[in-house]
């Protein structure tokens, strides 16, 4: 039935989510649009390069956004790449290695939005009802993607990696695979501004 949408049969995580007894207080930061991001992926060819994160941060700079960087301890080197290229970004909160796998679904549920490539955390975000921005790069989003409230950003001409035909090397560099246009950055900003939690943050700031 082509009339059905993701809202007719939403996916969900097993509830109640495991809530840690203690957790980083910054997850409760008030008056901010909390955006979770994954800067790396198991398949390193799916890792979004630093320049793309900088472009996203710059486009959202006039909004009260905080970027929460999730990841396993061995992903710190990717955060170091961003720091080497652009210095310490003031609204990037490094949670790499600080959230256990058991605590991850609940922690991601605290986000207002999640931005990443086709990696595990976008599916966790989707399962806990967090809107997703998928930077699909070389991955076929027609075949597999989060199915909830999702914004797709990328170029279909770059699609060449599939569920049963995964590739680890590509003729294009990652900067080309994940390139974002001005139009797609505008769509991203519009998507963020349309989130109910974002509107509350704007109201709190008097915007």
Can you annotate each of these PLM segments?
Residues 1-46, 50, 198-206:
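Mid-sequence helix-capping/hinge segment at a functional interface
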Residues 45, 77, 124, 142-143:
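Glycine/Thr-rich phosphate-binding loops of Rossmann-like dinucleotide-binding domains
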Residues 52-137:
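Donor-binding and catalytic core of enzymes assembling or modifying cell-surface/extracellular glycoconjugates
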Residues 20-21, 100-104, 157-163:
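A short acidic, often aromatic-flanked loop/helix-cap motif at beta-alpha or helix-coil junctions
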Residues 94, 126-206:
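Nucleotide-sugar donor-binding patch of glycosyltransferase catalytic domains
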Residues 41-43, 74, 139-140:
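Short, glycine/serine-rich, charged loops/turns that create anion-binding
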């Amino acid at each position: 039935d082509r009339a059905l949408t993701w809202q007719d049969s939403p996916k969900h995580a097993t509830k109640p989510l495991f809530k840690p007894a203690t957790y980083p207080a910054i997850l409760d930061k008030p008056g901010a649009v909390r955006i979770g991001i994954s800067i790396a992926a198991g398949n390193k060819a799916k890792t979004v390069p630093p320049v793309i994160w900088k472009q996203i941060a710059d486009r959202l700079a006039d909004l009260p956004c905080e970027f929460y960087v999730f990841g396993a301890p061995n992903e710190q080197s990717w955060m170091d790449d961003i720091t080497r290229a652009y210095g310490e970004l003031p609204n990037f909160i490094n949670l790499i290695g600080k959230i256990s796998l058991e605590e991850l679904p609940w922690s991601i549920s605290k986000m207002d939005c999640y931005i990443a490539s086709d990696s595990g955390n976008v599916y966790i975000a989707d399962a806990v009802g967090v809107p997703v921005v998928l930077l699909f790069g070389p991955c076929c989003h027609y075949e597999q993607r989060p199915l909830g409230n999702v914004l797709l950003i990328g170029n279909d001409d770059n699609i060449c990696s599939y569920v049963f035909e995964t590739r680890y090397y590509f003729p294009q560099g990652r900067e080309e695979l994940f390139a974002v246009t001005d139009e797609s950055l505008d769509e991203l900003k519009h998507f963020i501004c349309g989130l109910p939690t974002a509107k509350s943050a704007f109201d709190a700031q008097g915007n």
